[in-house]
Amino acid sequence: GSGPTYCWNEANNPGGPNRCSNNKQCDGARTCSSSGFCQGTSRKPDPGPKGPTYCWDEAKNPGGPNRCSNSKQCDGARTCSSSGFCQGTAGHAAA
């Protein structure tokens, strides 16, 4: 990863969950081991304050992927639309 607040969903990595080819494919301060697995300390479960660095996995929302009841269920600076979908720009690289 790129530091304790770096947000990356390792489950979606091209080589499979927690598999990596570089540090950017590992969450938080984790690094990619020589055997191709993410290792070390991931980000804190708390997504932090809402804004461009806010990290939230919309795929796990109760109403379904990208569905929301409030903006805290949307990644980065995205907001929840009146129709219940996350909209706008996510704040981190997506897998």
UniProtKB/Swiss-Prot annotation:
Q: What does this protein do?
A: Has strong anti-HIV activity against T-tropic strains of HIV-1 and weaker activity against M-tropic strains of HIV-1. Inhibits HIV-1 fusion and infection of CD4 LTR beta-gal cells in vitro. Inhibits fusion of HIV infected CEM-SS cells with uninfected CEM-SS cells, and fusion of HIV-1 Env expressing HL2/3 cells with CD4 LTR beta-gal cells. Binds to HIV gp120, HIV gp160 and to a lesser extent HIV gp41. Binding to HIV gp120 is glycosylation dependent.
- The set of disulfide-linked cysteines is 7-55, 20-32, 26-38, 68-80, 74-86
Q: Name one GO biological process term.
A: regulation of defense response to virus
Task: Work out whether the entry's keyword set contains DNA repair.
Answer: no
Which superkingdom heads the taxonomic lineage of this protein's source? Bacteria
What are the record keywords, sorted? Antiviral protein, Disulfide bond, Lectin
Specify where the region named SD2 lies, as residue ranges: 51-89
Is Disulfide bond found in the keyword set? yes
Q: Where do the record's region annotations for SD1 lie?
A: 3-41
Q: Which organism is it from?
A: Scytonema varium
Protein name, entry field:
Scytovirin
Q: May I ask which residue range the UniProt record assigns to the signal sequence?
A: none
Q: In the record, what terms sit under GO molecular function?
A: polysaccharide binding
